[in-house]
Amino acid sequence: MMKVLVVVALLVTLISYSSSEGIDDLEADELLSLMANEQTRAKACTPRYYDCSHDRHSCCRSSMFKDVCTCFYPEGGDNKEVCTCQQPKHLKYMEKATDKIKNLFG
């Protein structure tokens, strides 16, 4: 049993060492250019209660959860769909509960 544990520990050490060597092979310039490309891809999020019909995955995050683009047909006979970023009620209650717990123990 002890031999098996030693072999497993040796394998884990070798695997972690080989993966860290691969990271060291990247040059700093390449890593910086990759990060710059990632930052340019980020787009502005849509605030709560604003129109999100142009991009339904663009809603901003609250302190804990991401808002959801909710679509509905308003009353009044107009059959045009309206979409806004909203926070679901169950997530709203969860955020309030965690805030109260943090204030109680924090």
From Swiss-Prot:
Residue span(s) of the pro-peptide: 21-41
Entry's Gene Ontology cellular component terms: extracellular region
Localization per record: Secreted
Molecular-function annotations in GO: toxin activity
Family, per entry: Belongs to the neurotoxin 19 (CSTX) family. 02 (D7) subfamily.
Domain remarks: The presence of a 'disulfide through disulfide knot' structurally defines this protein as a knottin.
Protein name, entry field: Toxin-like structure LSTX-D3
Organism from which the protein derives: Lycosa singoriensis (Wolf spider)
